[in-house]
């Protein structure tokens, strides 16, 4: 009743319950129901709003059209400006060439090769190269002192532009050579005009072409300009100064450009030139621009103009072209029609919405009722999940009491029948609590209450433990069960070891259940080394494929772990060997791991579980991850199970930040793979992880050499992986004769030969050489000089009969037979027995002497058990007393504080987490505070630092999720032990407090 009342109070505060109460207590109206009178007003508002939007659309489109019109005008204007500039540049180059001609043949040669007749004839015949020039002429530079001599020599009088005798000046520039079209310029002083004089002086000072301002040309009365180039009487230095240029100047070549004709010809060559109007200006004086072409009066569309710069080669003068459209832009009918169409469409939409609003008002009451029913259903579903998740502790507690009492009962004196009954009840209880745990885990996931731990753990040790769970079943079926972890995977990762173990256990358990021959292979590597398995493979078989599979060549020669075909064809020896080669390409594996720890905060691992079982029918593959779903009804009848394991595994994988997929082929097998994100543990893995999950493998085998004889390369690589974990150097041979050849002949001590200390022979390889061949190889070994270094012979077998065992002994395997699946700790224990190295010691999670070791640790120790449940106290006290401990009990945290007042004689305390009044966390915090106070008083009295009081406190919990590793450490606990007490868990919990640390063996 108390539990139900507690659940009821919790549900009353649930958001869905509150929502349901609000809806049932007060009927809520939606916006449309509450404002139905506003529907007509909203319709008018909609019309106004759509009219405004249509106006905005028209404006946007009209602006876009104007922008495009402006861009077109700019493009056309720039095109004309470039063409005018290019044609002008060509004519300028011809005038420059004429200036060089005069300089070369008139001044560089003596006597001159040019006279008026020659110049006139040459310029007339080459006039086609200067179509833009009305004429060219050459004016000689004459200083005042040379004027009289010049006039006598040429028989002329230097005149001004007005045809009058030129007055006395410092310098003159009379024309001596002229084209026939401008013959009227002969003897006229080109420097008689003020502007002309400045242009000529600027030309000789710069050595470049100069232009005059626009003026009316004689004869044509068109606007034009005069281009002037200096002519030099001697060659100039590479970089002449202004004085050198003026001194070397002998005359000037000039040409007149008819700008109006030039632009008219240019525009006539362009299509559509009537569309725009062009004006050319001299803007040297920006305040008073001079027109060179075009109408001075504004015509056309003056609202849009474009200016293009012109460069005629004279940096002093600036010119530009201004363009505008000949006609104004027409109305934008496209924008107008689009805006009107948009307005009409939106008006229709508004009318439809108005009608829909009226209809919604009518059906809103029905919708409100349906919504209320939906909330009720959701509240009931959440209440169910919340109830199951909340009572998980209460359900587990009596079950743990039953299992604990059965465990204590089995330690008493029982006859065979009683022991059989008790063992059967214990097995059924464990199966029941496992099923309860799965159902509660699913409920926690649905309720969103499942939390993941983040503690350091040894992933390889976890996988070895999973294999040990199914070792008996795999041996009974004759299955190859193996695990392989890439060297790139860190030794220690941060994550939830329990949930990781649960996922792998579910997948391996399913594989063992549905596999009758072949193998089950677990592989772990970094996700970057392998593309994830997708469901695309079985789609290929589904589309046109059959569920009947034909095995290749009898199905027992494929390069897989067992030789049977696997569902995922990528898991063959070639890809597996490539993965191993990638690992060995780098340097030492530990160096790689340290490097990875320095640059990455987390690592993504991919775990593949491959089997050669019955596979999954294609019709069931789409729903395989649904809860409580199996392939068909016959699966449950033949194999048992609830169909919830894969569903929970999928949820756990997603909580770990990964994905789970599979490839399955009926009668071939299945390959499940999942990825998961783990943190990288950067602290000292030995000192920190020993507290939780760390497999302390022996180091006494480092430096030993071994040969693995196995004809299956994948299986040999797995054996090599486990031996490498023990520090053994390994070579692989596919036959015993190859193993002998590895060591050479007649000289085992020769340099460079591989002298093995141990030879591991797979049972298959031994059976192949059973008829005397193996003994012959041994004799050959002895005859080849190995008589004093005969290695230890160890046989590896999945299962072996008594007859086969006797034959193995007679064949030379007198040392031992290791039964698979292989685990590093188990192999290490066997090697210690075979080689006689070291004493028996703890290997991973295996206790050296079973209950005797726990008894040796706990015998005579005074231990306090704190738990509010009397059954739990009796179970814990009984288990600890069975191991020789002196146990006292307390039923609450307050009672524990009273019993632990200093001084006390307790060696350890087992503390329950969930207790009334004061839970285990709060009790632990207060105990640690009492210890700090006692330590301070002791140190102050003694004057020196003594050993501090620290009572080992271990959390007792039936649900580790509520007592995570971080929470235990935060409140001061030293670890936890799960209920009910089992020897393995109890040994791990107390060993580090009561056992002296073993001395390390140097490698």
Curated annotation (Swiss-Prot):
Membrane topology designation: Multi-pass membrane protein
Gene3D superfamilies: 1.10.287.130, 3.40.50.2300, 6.10.250.1190, CHASE domain, Histidine kinase-like ATPase, C-terminal domain
CDD domains: HATPase_EvgS-ArcB-TorS-like, HisKA, REC_hyHK_CKI1_RcsC-like
Domain CHASE: 110-322
Chief location of this protein within or outside the cell: endoplasmic reticulum
GO cellular component, one term: endoplasmic reticulum membrane
Annotated EC: 2.7.13.3
UniProtKB keywords: Calcium, Endoplasmic reticulum, Glycoprotein, Hydrolase, Kinase, Magnesium, Membrane, Metal-binding, Phosphoprotein, Receptor, Repeat, Transferase, Transmembrane, Transmembrane helix
GO molecular function: hydrolase activity; metal ion binding; phosphorelay sensor kinase activity
Residues reported to bind trans-zeatin: 196, 218, 228
The keyword Endoplasmic reticulum belongs to this UniProt entry's keyword annotation: yes
Function field: Cytokinins (CK) receptor related to bacterial two-component regulators. Functions as a histidine kinase and transmits the stress signal to a downstream MAPK cascade. This protein undergoes an ATP-dependent autophosphorylation at a conserved histidine residue in the kinase core, and a phosphoryl group is then transferred to a conserved aspartate residue in the receiver domain.
Protein name: Histidine kinase CRE1
